[in-house]
Design a protein with these regions (language model features):
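Short edge beta-strands and adjacent turn/loop segments
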Residues: 20-47, 313
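C-terminal boundary of histidine-terminating zinc-finger modules
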Residues: 325-336
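Flexible beta-alpha connector loops of hexameric P-loop NTPases
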Residues: 54, 187-200, 246-253
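Walker A/P-loop phosphate-binding motif and the immediately C-terminal alpha-helix
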Residues: 110-147, 262, 275
Length: 366
């Protein structure tokens, strides 16, 4: 086999190595420089995006594994460096170009805002588990923690100390359990509080939507703060095409307030797709169900809104333990009743078709 053929096979193998943060082939990202093969030894220049790249070990391991599959290569000389500023700027410009209006009207990403009327109904826990369950089904999933004052998503997914990676003007979100995650908690010091007025909240949400590079997503879940305040209004303005999932408990007080959050979403043009009832009873050892918070709240809200009750998630110790440990119950205890209910919800949302109504198809009619 000629050296030219081996080099061609080597480039093809490296094209299968995916940057774990950007989720693109490293060859497409211009992270592979010179390649040469001499007497069975392959020489490869690898350019990381930044100094101290958190994905460096993973990328280097995957490169070595890819090279090992190439026939005719018996050894590897891997030179690891860092992109120059010009190369990094070119990469940033290229990535920004591929994500123009990444969540605009023409986007095929399904956006689901998860809302509740009041706090303490388990909205964030359900959102985190739903994101992980969708990712486990093979979907590309992003999760934005829009609960700026009460952020909890990083802890629920086991990445409380993770920080995003910056490449130029772009922010690359950490990945947890196959989900790309961004939260204001990744930019604050432990033990500090966030106390901002409306304009600052709006700019934060806007920056999450424009400067965070999620790549090509099938689904973006947004964990809203409870209530009908500034963030909900901002997201209604920025993402009028988004769908809304309403979370409540069976209790009448929670159900009444949850309905109001759905009505505000509708006023901004968003579509309420369904209701999820959390804490819907505790399964006893004898199989009976103890209704600690009453019953019927979710069904009542769904009926008044004219949407389906998509799931009824029972009280579960495993669900709480999964949130405390950062290992969502859908992964830690998939046979738990709460996990099964959340998996069924993910299946319902994953198989729901997305229409093309209102989207430009880019066709030139002559």
């Amino acid at each position: 086999m000629s050296a030219e053929q081996i080099e061609s096979d080597l480039r093809a193998a490296l094209a299968r190595v995916i940057d774990p943060e950007i989720r693109r082939p490293i060859t497409e990202l211009d992270m592979v420089g010179d390649i040469a093969v001499t007497a069975g030894t392959a020489s490869v220049d690898l350019r990381l995006t930044i100094v101290g790249c958190p994905a460096a070990d993973t990328i280097e391991r995957d490169v070595r594994a890819a090279v090992a599959t190439v026939s005719g290569v018996t050894a590897l000389e891997l030179r690891v460096g860092v992109m120059s500023r010009e190369q990094r700027d070119a990469l940033t410009a290229r990535l920004k170009g591929t994500r123009t209006s990444q969540f605009g009207p023409d986007s095929f990403t399904r956006i689901i805002c998860v809302t509740s009327g009041k706090g303490g109904v388990g909205k964030s826990t359900l959102t985190a588990n739903l994101a992980v369950a969708l990712a486990a089904r093979g979907l590309s999933v992003g999760l934005m923690d829009a609960d700026v004052f009460g952020f909890s998503i990083p802890g629920l997914l086991g990445i409380p100390g993770s920080k995003p990676t910056r490449v130029g003007e772009l922010i690359l979100p950490p990945v947890a359990h196959g989900v790309k995650v961004i939260s204001i908690g990744m930019f604050t010091e432990p033990g500090t509080a966030v106390s901002w007025r409306g304009p600052m909240l709006h700019r934060t949400i806007q920056q999450f939507l424009t400067d965070v590079f999620f790549g090509d997503l099938d689904v973006l879940l947004i964990d809203l703060p409870p209530g009908t305040g500034d963030v909900a209004i901002s997201l209604g303005q920025l993402l009028p095409q988004a769908e809304v999932l309403v979370v409540t408990t069976p209790q009448a007080a929670a159900a009444d307030v949850a309905e109001r959050s759905a009505l505000v979403a509708r006023q901004t043009g968003q579509t309420v797709v369904g209701v999820v009832e959390n804490m819907a009873g505790l399964v006893q050892p004898d199989g009976s169900i103890l209704q600690l918070f009453g019953e019927g709240g979710g069904e009542a809200v769904a009926g008044r809104l004219g949407v389906p009750l998509l799931a009824s998630v029972p009280l579960s110790v495993a669900l709480r333990e999964g949130g405390d440990s950062g290992m969502p119950v859908v992964l830690a205890a998939p046979e738990d009743p709460a996990a099964r209910a959340l998996e069924a919800l993910a299946a319902t949302l994953a198989t729901r078709e997305r229409g093309l109504a209102g989207r430009r198809l880019g066709l030139n009619v002559t």
